[in-house]
């Protein structure tokens, strides 16, 4: 029984299927997942091979897994992560190991499209069936024999070439020696020259080297002599600089002492007393400023009152003139009588002469129009007055807001704080000067270092890094030379000629060393004369050895050689496009290092300068507060002026309001008069309703001519009366206001006289304040000068110490210079002696040349004899090697032929069994006679005309249907016939493999057949494969000998 669990596999999210060892039909429409069940079994057993479709993971999911359980075996294969787990009786195997066990138990995957595959694929599949596990071993044997034959051929060609080459070389060596013997005369041993002044037991070259060293040392001393002179000059400059600096410091000390003498009076006074005195003066100034502002306000009020008296006097004169210009009929005494008489006359007229009284209506109408005009004028005047009042009120509110926002006491406090801030500003300025002096001192040190840099090194700063890089390269060269010399002793015996290798910095020398060690790596002896090869991956030397008729591959690595090759490659990468690494003296290297140290010191000084500049920047930014003090004093003055303006605006507002009330009363009187006239009209005309102009006009047409003169008199009288009364009331109010103003003026003048000396008091206080403030500043300066004096004294001490040090250095340098002068004389003597040695060395070299010629002659003679004997031994070895290789080649050829013969026998026997099984199934599936045979044939693989032909076994299909031979691709068969032939091959392969564990899976194999034929086929399958799981997939339910039918829709 097989249990199949699917998770996110194709169209199945989470499904489990159970199959017994019986024939099962899986039926469902297209797209239901029938084939996915068979794919899942194949995926679990053999994975996603070439025949399986990819994309096993369900759409929208990240991974999938298939678990197949058979008896005590559980196989689980997952994708993302790709993992295979094989479990049997609590033993777990994974991935490749698990696949090996699956293939052993369930066999290899069957070929479903055997007929459609090429002849080469068919052959490969049949070979796997025929040989099973031993297929890989046979292929490995074939490959080994081929490789062995190839290597033997290559080696035989190499040895033949070497043999012919050595014979030619031997011949050429003998000919060369004979030609030389004809032309060269045998040289004689030369006489040894003698040097008279030579030191005992020391060679002339050693003596020369010793003298050269002495000369070099003396030259160095001369160089040191010049360096000491330059140092002495620099020290003299330093001394002059220090003297100047000491003089400057002394001058500064004198200046500060003079300043202290000038400010000596303030030594007893403390800063707190001065500050307290300034605060008291500020308080008194505050009180006096308040009084001063009050006086200014009173003065402005006095001026306003005086202006007002002038305006009142002008108005009074104008009113008096108007009063005099009125009609002479109106007199003060007879005023009331005149009016009563006029009114009594009118009353008698109203009673006795009604018609004559009605004529007055015209006058009243004109009066009404005039009243209406007056009303409109009064209205416009009231509107303009109201607007003016609103404007003035806004201005008053604005000025009041200004006065509210400005706090005079706070301003005075700010003024005192500003004085304190100005003191703080002076302290910070002093601190800033100290920091700037420090920066200047560090800059001096930095300039000294830059001078040293100019003296110690001639190159630029930009070139130092390049030179430093060159120094590093030189150190690498030295380390490489040390390593090369150390391994020479180890490799002397194995590799002769390693002693001659030298490296002085040239790239060509490195390439020579590389070539030597690479040749050594691949041509070293491995115990016997086995051929050498290179590994294609790691390039290690390999050898094929024959022991006891077995072929072994041997690897050999010399660690020293590999390590030096790595170091050579590293050094070659350092060269880039250069050919040599420039050699430098130790003194130059030391100069470069010293120069680099100086650069680092200069950078350290630059960092210190940056820190000090940041400290200067971080100091609180304060400014001189004198301008702010002046601006605050100006604001206090503007505040006082603002108060004066406010008083003016308030008086103006009062006047405007007064005029407005007058205008309102006037308009009320005019309105009352108009109402009176209207009432009279109602009574006179006799109309209860409102009087209209039409009624009046009709009335006027009758009585207009009679009442014209009387109307005029009445109008003049009444208007004059009103004007007169108004003028009288105005004169009265003006006189009252004048009395009030005179009293106010008297009080203001009295106040001003009492405080007449306030300006003098303020000036005195300001002078006293300025004096205290200057004393306070001077006190701060006094303290600064004290601290400055101490700093200058310390500087003077430091400069004196450095001056003493410089003088001691000068004395030591002078002593050294005296010693170096003696060395110059010694140098001249040694140079004369050196000339004598060089003349003798020339004679010595001539002797050495003649001796070398004699030695070379003897060496050549010995080498000739040795090379002839060597070539003869090499020729004998190569001939023996050729015989051995021929024997090995014949043995390999016989082995290859036997392997191919065994393969052919196994394949032909398998093909015969396949033909038998296939023919059995075809006889059951077809009514007509049909014969199908798999036949073996050998295809010739011949490349080129001269190449030897290679015969490769291949398989083809021969089909005789209805007595006719069909083509090899079976294209003449119908789809149903082709399906039956293909099914016969599938069943035959399954029966030959004889694996009852692996289920037989048939996917739509009878889709092109009718019901009866398909029933027949399935009954045949069931008979031939009893007690075995058979899975059949079909679109719809078909009849047949099925033990179980699964419909996926019902199952889902």
Swiss-Prot record:
Top-rank taxon: Viruses
SUPFAM superfamilies per UniProt: P-loop containing nucleoside triphosphate hydrolases (SSF52540)
Disulfide bridges in this chain: none
InterPro entries the record matches: P-loop_NTPase (IPR027417), RecF/RecN/SMC_N (IPR003395)
Family per record: Belongs to the IIV-6 050L family.
Protein's UniProt name: Uncharacterized protein 050L
Organism: Invertebrate iridescent virus 6 (IIV-6)
């Amino acid at each position: 029984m097989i249990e199949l669990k699917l998770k996110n596999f194709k169209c199945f999210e989470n499904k489990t299927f159970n199959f017994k060892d019986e024939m099962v039909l899986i039926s469902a429409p297209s797209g239901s997942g029938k084939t996915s069940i068979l794919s899942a079994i194949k995926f679990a057993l053999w994975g996603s091979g070439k025949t399986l479709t990819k994309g096993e993971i369900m759409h929208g999911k990240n991974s999938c897994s298939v678990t197949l359980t058979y008896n005590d075996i559980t196989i689980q294969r997952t994708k993302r992560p790709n993992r295979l787990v094989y479990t049997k009786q609590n033993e777990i195997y994974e991935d490749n190991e698990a696949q090996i066990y699956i293939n052993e138990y369930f066999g290899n995957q069957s070929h479903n499209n055997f007929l459609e595959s090429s002849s080469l694929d068919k052959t490969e599949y049949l070979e796997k069936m025929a040989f099973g596990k031993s297929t890989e071993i046979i292929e490995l044997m074939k490959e080994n024999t081929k490789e062995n034959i190839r290597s033997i051929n290559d080696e035989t060609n190499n040895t033949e070439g070497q043999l012919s080459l050595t014979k030619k070389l031997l011949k050429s060596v003998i000919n060369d020696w004979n030609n030389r013997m004809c032309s060269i005369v045998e040289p004689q041993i030369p006489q040894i020259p003698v040097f008279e002044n030579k030191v005992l037991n020391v060679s002339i070259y050693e003596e020369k080297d010793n003298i050269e060293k002495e000369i070099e040392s003396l030259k160095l001393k001369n160089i040191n002599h010049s360096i000491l002179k330059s140092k002495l000059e620099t020290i003299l400059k330093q001394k002059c600089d220090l003297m100047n600096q000491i003089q400057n410091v002394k001058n500064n000390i004198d200046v500060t002492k003079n300043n202290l003498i000038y400010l000596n009076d303030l030594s007893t006074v403390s800063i707190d007393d001065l500050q307290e005195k300034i605060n008291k003066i500020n308080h008194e100034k505050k009180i006096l400023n308040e009084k001063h502002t009050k006086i200014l306000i009173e003065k402005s009020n006095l001026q306003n009152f005086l202006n007002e008296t002038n305006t009142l006097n002008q108005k009074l004169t104008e009113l008096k003139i108007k009063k005099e210009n009125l009609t002479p009929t109106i007199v003060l005494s007879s005023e009331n009588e005149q009016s009563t008489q006029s009114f009594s006359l009118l009353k008698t007229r109203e009673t006795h002469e009604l018609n004559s009284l009605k004529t007055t209506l015209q006058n009243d109408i004109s009066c009404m129009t005039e009243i209406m005009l007056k009303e409109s004028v009064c209205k416009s005047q009231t509107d303009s007055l109201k607007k003016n009042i609103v404007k003035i009120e806004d201005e008053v509110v604005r000025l009041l807001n200004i006065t509210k926002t400005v706090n005079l006491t706070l301003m005075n406090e700010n003024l005192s704080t500003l004085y304190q801030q100005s003191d703080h500003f002076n302290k910070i300025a002093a601190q800033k000067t100290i920091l700037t002096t420090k920066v200047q001192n560090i800059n001096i040190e930095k300039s000294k270092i830059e001078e040293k840099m100019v003296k110690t090194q001639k190159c630029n700063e930009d070139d130092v890094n390049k030179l430093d890089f060159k120094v590093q390269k030189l150190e690498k060269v030295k380390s490489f030379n040390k390593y090369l010399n150390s391994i020479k002793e180890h490799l002397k015996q194995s590799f002769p000629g390693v002693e001659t290798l030298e490296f002085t910095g040239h790239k060509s020398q490195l390439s020579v060393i590389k070539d030597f060690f690479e040749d050594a790596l691949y041509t070293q002896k491995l115990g016997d004369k086995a051929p050498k090869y290179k590994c294609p991956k790691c390039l290690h030397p390999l050898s094929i050895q024959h022991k006891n008729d077995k072929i072994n591959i041997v690897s050999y690595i010399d660690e020293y050689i590999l390590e030096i090759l790595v170091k050579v490659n590293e050094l070659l990468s350092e060269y880039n496009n250069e050919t040599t690494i420039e050699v430098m003296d130790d003194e130059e290297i030391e100069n470069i290092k010293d120069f680099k140290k100086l650069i680092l010191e200069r950078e350290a000084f630059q960092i210190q300068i940056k820190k000090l500049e940041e400290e200067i920047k971080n100091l609180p930014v304060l400014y001189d507060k004198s301008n702010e003090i002046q601006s605050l004093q100006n604001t206090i003055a503007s505040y006082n002026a603002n108060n004066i303006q406010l008083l003016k605006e308030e008086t103006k507002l009062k006047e405007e309001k007064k005029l407005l009330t007058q205008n309102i009363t006037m308009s009320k009187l005019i309105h009352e008069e108009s109402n009176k006239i209207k009432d009279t009209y109602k009574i006179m005309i006799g109309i209860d309703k409102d009087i209209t102009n039409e009624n009046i006009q009709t009335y006027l047409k009758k009585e207009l001519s009679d009442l014209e003169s009387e109307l005029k008199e009445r109008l003049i009288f009444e208007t004059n009366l009103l004007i007169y009364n108004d003028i009288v009331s105005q004169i009265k109010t003006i006189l009252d206001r004048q009395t009030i103003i005179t009293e106010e003026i008297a009080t203001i003048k009295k106040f001003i006289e009492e405080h007449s000396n306030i300006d003098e008091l303020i000036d005195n206080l300001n002078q006293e304040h300025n004096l205290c403030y200057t004393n306070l500043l001077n006190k701060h300066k006094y303290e600064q000068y004290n601290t400055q004096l101490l700093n200058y004294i310390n500087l003077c001490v430091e400069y004196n110490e450095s001056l003493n040090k410089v003088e001691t250095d000068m004395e030591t340098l002078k002593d050294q210079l005296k010693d170096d002068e003696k060395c110059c004389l010694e140098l001249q003597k040694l140079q004369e002696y050196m000339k004598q040695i060089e003349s003798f060395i020339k004679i010595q070299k001539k002797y050495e040349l003649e001796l070398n010629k004699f030695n070379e002659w003897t060496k050549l003679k010995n080498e000739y004899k040795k090379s002839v004997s060597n070539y003869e031994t090499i020729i004998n070895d190569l001939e023996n090697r050729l015989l051995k290789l021929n024997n090995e080649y014949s043995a390999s050829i016989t082995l290859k032929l036997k392997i191919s013969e065994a393969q052919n026998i196994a394949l032909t026997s398998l093909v015969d069994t396949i033909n038998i099984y296939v023919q059995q199934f075809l006889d059951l599936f077809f009514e007509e006679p049909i014969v199908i045979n798999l036949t073996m044939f050998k295809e010739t693989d011949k490349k080129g005309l001269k190449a030897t032909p290679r015969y490769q076994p291949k398989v083809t299909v021969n089909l005789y249907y209805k007595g006719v031979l069909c083509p090899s691709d079976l294209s003449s068969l119908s789809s149903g016939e082709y399906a039956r032939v293909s099914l016969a091959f599938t069943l035959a392969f399954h029966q030959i493999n004889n694996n009852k564990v692996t289920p037989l899976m048939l996917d739509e194999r009878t889709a092109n057949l009718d019901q009866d034929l398909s029933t027949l086929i399935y009954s045949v399958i069931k008979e031939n494969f009893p007690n075995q799981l058979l899975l059949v997939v079909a679109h719809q339910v078909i009849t047949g000998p099925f033990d179980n039918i699964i419909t996926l829709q019902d199952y889902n």
